[in-house]
Amino acid sequence: MSGFTNKDGRQNLAPCFNFRSSPFRLTVGERELKLEEDKNQLSKGLDPWTSNPTASASTLHYLLQEKERAQQAHEQLQIYQQQQGFGSFLQHRIRQPASRGPGGGGGGGDGGGSSGESTPVDALATAFGAGRIVRSAAGRKDRHSKVCTARGLRDRRVRLAAHTAIRFYDVQDRLGYDRPSKAVDWLMRNAKAAIDELPDRAEAPPPPAAASTEQPEGTEQANSTSYGFGNTTGGTMTSAASAAAGSFLPHSLGADRVSDSVKSLFPSSSTASGAASAGHDEYRGSPPDLLSRTTSNQQPQELCLTLQSNQHQIFSHVSSNHHGMISSAGVPGWPDHSQRMQAWHAPENSTGDGRGGGNGDGYMFAMPSRQGLDQSQLFSHGEPLQSSGRGWASARAWLDPLAVAAIHHQPSTMAAGQVGFGHLVGGAGGGGGFMGFLAPAAQRLEGEEEHGSEVIR
């Protein structure tokens, strides 16, 4: 290192480097590498010209904070502009009803409430022709924009039904327009006369309440006539009685198979002229000529209670072994001749077990009442019970007292008996009949070994 002499002859004491022997002498490639390293250090927040990394890090942190402040200020400015734009839109909406008058303002308020669309807070109202387009400030696509109408904000895009869209595009193709909006403008121009005749925002009349309530009643009446016993003069059955009748009466049975021997199935009563309210009272209070009226018509009606009769005298005697505890003596309103009701679908060559060929169906009969049990107690379990013949164990718990009374009573003590009608059930092959009165053939009383008939429960 040596000094050098200026033009005026004075010596410059500034240091002078010998670049030939200096280690700082770098080639072009080395200089480029050095610049790249400097850039990398600057990007990492390190100052290559200083040896204090703490100072360079604090400087970079300050720059980042300033950048964040600038971003926050920009966002606040955007929010302020959005609020100003939306405020002008609200002021415009407030001035519109005032210019229309009190009548128009009231209609506009009702229309805005009935639109069902909430006004977005971040929306911007942009003037577009004669109307306004409300765009979202979040930068979403144009399909989310809305227009200001007399009844509030509405979507610009309109969904059409499939057949309507097909017809509309056919009209557009025939007109030769490339955009659907042009076809809509053409349709509105041609329908201007009809549009002008329309009232302003006519409200649709509310649907009549009477028409909506009459339809279910008609349906219930149709169900009651198809599921009931065909009582056309005594009034229609209620919905509960209709459901109870439809729960066990088959549809496939016709009225042509009804025998004359079962016309006197129900006890005669001069006061029972109308249908009962619900449950077992429906069947117990039926008029005496219920079946005769339905079968004597010129056009046979569908009678779901179809019973086939054979010539076995089921109810004409009482068995000596107490298996046929059946009696109709002393029952008021019943005729003196024997009453019988054969099993459903009983074959002609039915066996002598009293079950109609073992099809799981039983008979309806009169059973004497136990002392201390009145008619209401006998029918305390009048709910419709469904059984397939294998579920007798669940019903025997409350039938045991009646079974004991039926077995140990003599036929002479059955003068003041009550008529008990159970619910008709059908079995798949293992016992059945009227719930609460007949037991399956497999379940016998203790000490009895006889076969060929059912034990009456």
From Swiss-Prot:
InterPro entries to which the protein is assigned, alphabetical: TF_TCP_subgr, Transcription_factor_TCP
GO (cellular component) term, any one: nucleus
Stretches with biased composition (Gly residues): 101-115
Keywords: Activator, Coiled coil, Developmental protein, DNA-binding, Nucleus, Transcription, Transcription regulation
GO molecular-function terms, A-Z: DNA-binding transcription factor activity; sequence-specific DNA binding
PROSITE patterns, per database record: TCP (PS51369)
Compositional bias per record (Low complexity), positions renumbered to this chain: 268-278
Cellular compartments annotated: Nucleus
Transmembrane segments: none
Main location: nucleus
Domain of life of the source: Eukaryota
Composition-biased stretches (Polar residues): 212-230
Coiled-coil region: 58-84
Region ranges (Disordered): 95-121, 199-231, 263-299
Domain TCP: 140-198
Biological role: Transcription activator. Binds the promoter core sequence 5'-GGNCC-3'.
Complex formation: Forms homodimers and heterodimers.
Protein name: Transcription factor PCF7
Originating species: Oryza sativa subsp. indica
Lineage of producing organism: Eukaryota, Viridiplantae, Streptophyta, Embryophyta, Tracheophyta
